[in-house]
Amino acid sequence: MKIILTLSIFLICFLQLGQSVIDPSQNEVMSDLLFNLYGYDKSLDPCNSNSVECDDINSTSTIKTVISLNLPTPLQEYVITQDLTPLQNLTYMELYEKIYLTLSFFKNINKLTQLETIVTLSFNVTIPDDTIFPASLETFSIYKPSVPLSIAIFGSNIKNLYVNSPLTGYSIPTLINVNPYLENLQLPVTYYSGFPSNISLAFPNLQYLTIYVNNDMDQNNYHNFSISNIGVFKNLKGLDIEFTDSYNPQEFSINSFLSNVPVIDSLYIYGQGVTIDPSVGIIDLSYVKSKKFLSINIQESSLLNNCKGKSFKSPKKAYFRSNYNTFSYACIDFSNLAYFYDYYNEYEQYLPNIDNAPLLNEIYISESVVVGDIPESYCRINYLGLNYNQLNGTAPSCILCLGGNRGGDIVLPNPLLNFNKTSEPYCPTFKIDQNYTNLVATDGIGKLIITGTNLGWYGNDITPITANSKLAITIPKGVGTNKSITVTFQNGEQRTFNYSYVPPFIKSYGFLELDSNKYLTINGTGFDFENPNIITINGQQITFSIALGGGDNDGLIALPIDELPNFDSETKFTVSTLVGGQSSNEVTFYYFNSINITEEKLVLNNTGGSVDINGSFGTNNISLVSISINGTNCLVTSYTNSKLTIQYPSKQVGDNYVLTLNVGGYAVNLVVEYIEGGETPTPSTTPSTTPSTTPSTTPSSTPTQSPGDDGSTSSTLSISFYLITLLLLTQQFI
């Protein structure tokens, strides 16, 4: 028995030594905090609580440190008076309702140097304006504030500030110092809260702004208010304005916001009370220059209720989505819209007139009080849905062509006079024009473009360019001439089309390194994407790879550099090929081991201008040098083999441009961004040696270790092993 007792004591001691323990100073703080909040036993490890997350201080230590607090609502209100500064590795802190922070916490918050996120669902402490927040703090979420928000919050390094559900006593500073760090701001606004008059200047890098407007006129002492003179948000991408749903909302004009967001991508408006300024009479967003397109989402709003004429105008290719709004389609200027969605609109009316909407590609109107006919003009819409309305007129010919089985998915249920689920396809006007272009690319993305009348929307290998009148038939990879394909149209009609693949065309060459191997690449079109390509270089036939790339880019074929004949620098060599029985052009290139551009990216003015480009160009012969941007030639005004100057053309603002430097057929690409006016920023300087087309490659699968995994056996496994050993030994002595 003595031996058993001794072994048991040894086992307990061993396990205590093998287990990780929390840092003593943190243990004291957390034990007291958890006990006062939830009655948590002070003898227990706080790290074992569901409210606390701990981790090893480092990979070799068994000492635990608190990294996250998630404190749920206690039975009674509690003010955290404990000094939390020992929690030096705390990164995340979330406090539910009835838990309050103190002034002392914020006076010492800069000592929590790894704190990244604070979420507090009850907030009643006035933070001093001289408070310094840690540089690590990125997100501060405040719910139910009942005190003024300190200017220190708005002047910190915080990137994301979210404020919700204000209580009496809440207010916002009316002037804020310039803060380049804040990117996402969410603020409630009431008639008593105030609003920063210089918000656009104070936050020059603000990306997303959400304003919650409390506009309940039934609230005690409530009165009208508005926000104006906010300035221009030069970098704002998203604007979200939401109004408290109310039976008695105030009228709140938002023109001051909507006229100052030149580059937003997203606009969301929710709730009753929002209006168009009667002195302006229109919301004109056509000036907005989104990076891609502007998405407009209006939900349960009074914005367009009493509009007069075309009161809402969007920028080109905008999305417009409406849910539970009551408005006339006459309010909307459709000329720039690409997508229009309207659900649950109780305004009785006909379908919108889209004769002057050339960009409109998609229409979905559902669960709305639209009546009358479906116009023939709707046959050109590529994505169309008119289900669950009250359309009681006639369906157009393109729907009749499909019959109830297929066309019903687009326009039923509706009480149409000439169309229902059992209608048979009727299409006497189905017609295919014979003058289509029958040359297609070899990369499998090539299309036969056909035109006609009532062709439908889809079919096998068919997609719409303009529904019913212009369709694209996808042709598989291949080479050669005199091919054919048979397709079935949406109305069941079958047709066979003849085509040939484009002949090969050689454009340029370059070099590519993959997995420490160097390849010569030849770029062009019409290569074989299924079989190796045979290239003739100076009369010698050499086998290159299957073509890669394609699509919007040229194809690329590759040859290991050690299989290439030896050439001296600037040596001429001729290149040609034969693909699918079709001969390419024969080109003369000049051989260079390397051509590169020092800049990683060029940023140019959209008005055009002059710019220097540095690099190693391999030759002093300017006659071998040409430069273009997306196919538009640039004038080389000055040249050495390490620096050149070009006059570049004007382009629309965007970052999807490519500059191609061609030296004797050796092509190097460089990403180009066009910006609005101003000075051209200094380019970054990572050398570019990219060939004109870079293939997509999949990295080899390489085993990796998880962070902190040094490959050694875990402490849990070691403890388990010794525990089993001790138990086995114990059994021998019983």
UniProtKB/Swiss-Prot annotation:
Prosegment residue ranges: 709-734
Keyword set includes Signal: yes
Localization in the cell: Cell membrane
GO cellular component: phagocytic vesicle; plasma membrane; side of membrane
Topology with respect to the bilayer: Lipid-anchor; GPI-anchor
Major localisation: membrane
Protein name, as recorded: Cell surface glycoprotein gp138B
